[in-house]
UniProtKB/Swiss-Prot annotation:
Gene Ontology cellular-component annotations: cell envelope Sec protein transport complex; cytosol; plasma membrane
Catalyzed reactions per annotation: ATP + H2O + cellular proteinSide 1 = ADP + phosphate + cellular proteinSide 2
Manner of cofactor binding, per the entry note: May bind 1 zinc ion per subunit.
Protein name: Protein translocase subunit SecA
Gene: secA
The UniProt record lists the keyword Zinc: yes
Species annotation: Pelobacter propionicus (strain DSM 2379 / NBRC 103807 / OttBd1)
InterPro entries: Helicase_ATP-bd, Helicase_C-like, P-loop_NTPase, SEC_C_motif, SecA, SecA_CS, SecA_DEAD, SecA_motor_DEAD
SMART domains to which the protein is assigned, alphabetical: SecA_DEAD, SecA_PP_bind
Assigned protein family: Belongs to the SecA family.
One Gene Ontology MF term: ATP binding
Binding site for ATP: Q87, G105, E106, G107, K108, T109, D512
Pfam families referenced in this protein's UniProt entry, alphabetically: P-loop_SecA, SEC-C, SecA_DEAD, SecA_PP_bind, SecA_SW
Enzyme class: translocase
Highest classification ranks of the organism: Bacteria, Pseudomonadati, Thermodesulfobacteriota, Desulfuromonadia, Desulfuromonadales
Length: 896
């Protein structure tokens, strides 16, 4: 009550943020009178003036009102669009390094031009990040006209662009591109053998479009560049053949007291946990698998791989469904993005799961790959000095944006009031009844001519609905991952009279649905179908389409605008809001309603018990629906529970990945220094001295007399590392200390190295050191990534030993990293002292061989794959430590 009173008197935090910006809007509007009369050339000269003033110390904040006024005027002249006042506010929020939440149709693409232009004045580059190649190309071409008019350069980074062109595009003042391409370029750069081959420059300012999709939905998806291993794929077929012989079981009553409480007993050979998407063999199942695979003990270290692949095969058969989680296209298993419904070609599930699904579907199994380089979007985007974001739906995730990225969300007022009523959910007992009601609703709207956009959560459901509509004789378009090529075309016409569009979550983010249809898109479609037609004929067709669309627009507005029908609630409220947001853009009328059933995944897994009790209490008959605020609240609570669970997983992921991130920064910085040739000789001599220290520390014990040291081991280590037969005069043995031994060894090793330099020459030895250092770093870093993966997979089990998994992970990851540094050092020192060159060109040949390997991995064998968070396959008891690695009890964490 007190909180609402304070809000009434002082306004919400969001309102106060917006209020502070209105005076700057007024200042920009005042400047319009002096900017408008300028000629095109004078307007362009303003950019050079701003650069000069900034170079002399004037801040970008001070330049902002003038720069925004210039950008707005240029937009009027070039694009025919003048930024609204609320769009100016959106631009200021982005410039200040925050997230602008702007409703669909409020012109986010145009808003981004303001902070992009202002920040490009510094000359340090601006990256505008989009979710796909189509939007990156479209926006760079569309808005690029504005930037070019103002004297700025524009680049675009999409799949298939060669390195030389990428370098030019990154050097531009403003660079558009996809999140994947930006991330992969960072990884690829740090695998190169010359700084001249790098394509990226510094991380100055990024504006992330659809920021919720990239920084929340994709946060658990690391970018991975990997190369093939030589493991056989036969094992996947062998294991796949035994899966149909295993019977799914259920949990029996908890029986048999144990030290940790009651133990769950199971029927059948395996059980599944839909919440965790995991499958577990029962004791009976383990015995059966051992018999089928003809192995004695599945838990024997030599057979543990069989156990792992059996569990992955169980998941493939029991948890992953064709046309829901993936599709089979052209003999390949392609993942379907659960958030957008789009196909993700090239992406693969890790840890043998993808191969298990390939075996299940009977397609060719591709080898598992070994990670060569990896980074999460969370850590990639945190490298930018300043980060801003835009989306229509961020407020529900405001806490996560603030906690993980230090990004505040500011909700920007709409230019025109939102006129869309969102009707209460309608809930049925069964999916059959629900679909019957959806079809009836579509028929009623189709009869009047009002367009409908019907949202489904999977390809499978969209095709079921399509089949039902075909039976009713209702023409419609289906937009799912199978028809993604026609996405923009279908979405742009979804607002026409009598248009019925069924869409998975992808629903064409980035393409506006115009009521009455999009005349330009229709004319472009006609032009593609009639390439021989002349410009005059095209203009006549365009004029005709504009007349038709204008008439349809007025009729659709009269009918109530675009009607949204949701056929299922998503786990995230944000995705539901995105579907609703397709309607009611820029003051257009519209409406939305969700139809649900107790058989829907969200209600079945997370909340149906309470809802079912309410329906039983109200004696709901078959075919009868219910709309009740209490049920809506239960559904929202189920969604909040899932959102909180997913947030916890992402938070734990970043805490673990931060450890890896620091190690990656050290390795990549060292690599760049080597490529820059900075003090490379001094770096090698430091390695040499550290190797001497390591040998002495290992075998020369401070408190023991020198006679008792392990001299055989010392001599072997010295010979192995330095190719040196170390001889110690007998008369020095009695008074020798570890410090004295270190000094003698270092002196002899330095002398030997000096002889090598004299023999090979300064340039050749420096080149050799550089090549050997890079080779050692790349080889051992790859192995280190594999070791870290293995560590991460098993670390959750430490909780059972009353240890904090996170602390154990940090400690062991540090030990692994120190081991990595030591192995790199030893290998470089050994190679420099042992390598025999018959001719100087051999160093370049070694370097070229290494470089060509990287090119293979980068271009033909590179693979971007989805790596799911590691989970323990054991089902945790309520008082057990949570397998997610938080260190809390399961009942207090993911088991809530």
């Amino acid at each position: 009550m007190f909180g609402s009173l304070v809000k009434k008197v002082f306004g919400s935090k969001n309102e106060r943020e917006i209020k502070k910006l209105w005076p700057i809007v007024a200042r920009i509007n005042e400047l319009e009178a002096s900017i408008s009369p300028l000629s095109d050339e004078q307007l362009r000269d303003k950019t050079a003036e701003f650069k000069e003033r900034h170079g002399k110390g004037e801040s970008l904040d001070a330049l902002m009102p003038e720069a925004f006024a210039v950008c707005r005027e240029a937009s009027k002249r070039v694009l025919g669009m003048r930024h609204f006042d609320v769009q100016l506010i959106g631009g200021m929020v982005l410039h200040s390094g925050k997230i602008s939440e702007m409703k669909t149709g409020e012109g986010k693409t145009l808003v981004a031009t303001l902070p992009a232009y202002l920040n490009a004045i510094s000359g340090k580059g601006v990256h505008v990040v989009t979710v796909n190649d189509y939007l990156a190309r479209r926006d760079s071409e569309w808005m690029g006209r504005l930037y070019s008019f103002l004297g700025l350069t524009v680049g675009v980074i999409v799949h298939g662009v060669e390195d030389d062109q990428r370098r030019i595009n990154y050097a531009a003042d403003i660079t558009y591109g996809t999140n994947n391409e930006f991330g992969f370029d960072y990884l690829r750069d740090n695998m190169k053998f010359s700084l001249d081959d790098y394509v990226q420059r510094g991380f100055n300012f990024a504006i992330v479009d659809e920021v919720d999709s990239i920084l929340i939905d994709e946060a658990r998806t690391p970018l991975i560049i990997s190369g093939p291993t030589e493991d056989s794929t036969d094992k996947y077929y062998v294991i796949d053949r035994i899966i149909p012989l295993l019977k799914k079981g259920e949990v029996k009553e908890e029986e048999a007291n144990t030290l940790s409480g009651k133990r769950k007993l199971y029927t059948g050979d395996f059980t599944i946990d839909e919440k965790a998407k995991s499958a577990t063999l029962t004791e009976q199942g383990v015995l059966k698998v051992e018999k089928l695979l003809k192995v004695d003990n599945l838990y024997d270290p030599r057979n543990i791989e069989f156990l792992h692949h059996t569990q992955q095969a169980l998941r493939a058969h029991a948890m992953y469904r064709r046309d829901v989680d993936y599709v089979v296209k052209d003999g390949e298993v392609m993942i379907v993005d659960e958030f957008t419904g789009r196909l993700m070609p090239g992406r693969r599930w890790s840890d043998g799961l993808h191969q298990a699904i390939e075996a299940k579907e009977g397609v060719t199994i591709e080898n598992e790959n070994q990670t060569l380089a990896t980074i999460t979007f969370q850590n990639y985007f945190r490298m930018y000095k300043k980060l801003g974001g835009m989306t229509g739906t961020a407020d529900t995730e405001a806490e996560e944006f603030h906690k993980i990225y230090k990004l505040d969300v500011v909700v920007i007022p709409t230019n025109r009031p939102l006129l869309r009523p969102d009707f209460p959910d309608v809930i049925y007992k069964t999916e059959r009844e629900k679909f019957g009601a959806v079809i009836q609703d579509i028929k009623e709207h189709y009869a009047t001519g009002q367009p409908c956009l019907v949202g489904t959560i999977s390809i499978e459901k969209s095709e079921v609905l399509s089949e039902l509509l075909k039976r009713e004789g209702i023409p419609h378009n289906v937009l799912n991952a199978k028809q993604h090529e026609r996405e923009a075309e279908i979405v742009s016409q979804a607002g026409r009279l009598k248009a019925i569009t069924i869409a998975t979550n992808m629903a064409g983010r980035g393409t506006d649905i115009l009521l009455g249809g999009n005349a330009d898109a229709l004319a472009s479609q006609w032009r593609r179908a009639n390439p021989e037609a002349g410009e005059e004929e095209y203009q006549a067709i365009l004029k005709n389409y504009k007349t038709v669309c204008a008439a349809e627009h007025d009729e659709v507005v009269r009918l109530g605008g675009l009607h949204i029908i949701g056929t299922e609630r998503h786990e995230s409220r944000r995705i539901d809001n995105q579907l609703r947001g397709r309607s009611g853009r820029q003051g257009d009328p519209g409406s939305s309603r969700f139809y649900l059933s107790l058989e829907d995944d969200l209600l079945r897994i997370f909340g149906s018990e309470r809802v079912s009790k309410i329906m039983d209490f109200l004696k709901i008959e078959e075919g009868e629906a219910i709309t009740h605020a209490m049920i809506n609240k239960s559904i929202e609570n189920a969604q909040k529970k899932v959102e909180a669970h997913n947030f916890d997983i992402r938070k734990h992921l970043i805490e673990y990945d931060d450890v890896m991130n620091k190690q990656r920064e050290v390795i990549y910085t060292q690599r760049r220094e080597i490529l820059g040739g900075q003090d490379i000789r001094e770096s090698f001599l430091e390695m040499l001295d550290e190797t001497v220290e390591e040998i002495v520390a290992s075998y020369a014990i401070e408190k023991s007399p020198a006679e008792e040291w392990d001299w055989q081991a010392i001599n072997e280590a010295v010979f192995k590392c330095f190719n040196l037969q170390f001889e110690l005069p007998q008369d020095t043995m009695a008074r020798l200390t570890p410090a004295g031994l270190k000094e003698m060894l270092a002196e002899q090793a330095h002398a030997l190295f000096a002889a090598r330099v004299k023999e090979m020459g300064d340039d050749l030895i420096d080149h050799l050191i550089k090549v050997m250092m890079l080779q050692a770093i790349d080889t051992h870093w790859k192995d280190h990534l594999l070791n870290i993966d293995h560590l991460k997979e098993g670390i959750g089990l430490r909780g059972y030993g009353q240890k904090d998994p996170k602390q154990e992970y940090k400690k062991e990851a540090y030990e692994l990293f120190m081991g990595l540094i030591m192995r790199i050092r030893e290998e470089v020192v050994e190679r420099i002292f042992w390598v025999q060159l018959e001719r100087p060109e051999e160093v370049e040949e070694i370097e070229e061989e290494q470089r060509s390997k990287k090119i293979v991995f980068n271009l033909s064998e590179e693979e971007e794959r989805v790596q799911e968070p590691a989970r323990s396959n054991r089902v945790a008891g309520r008082n057990d430590p949570c397998p997610c690695g938080s260190g809390k009890k399961y009942k207090k964490c993911c088991g809530k």
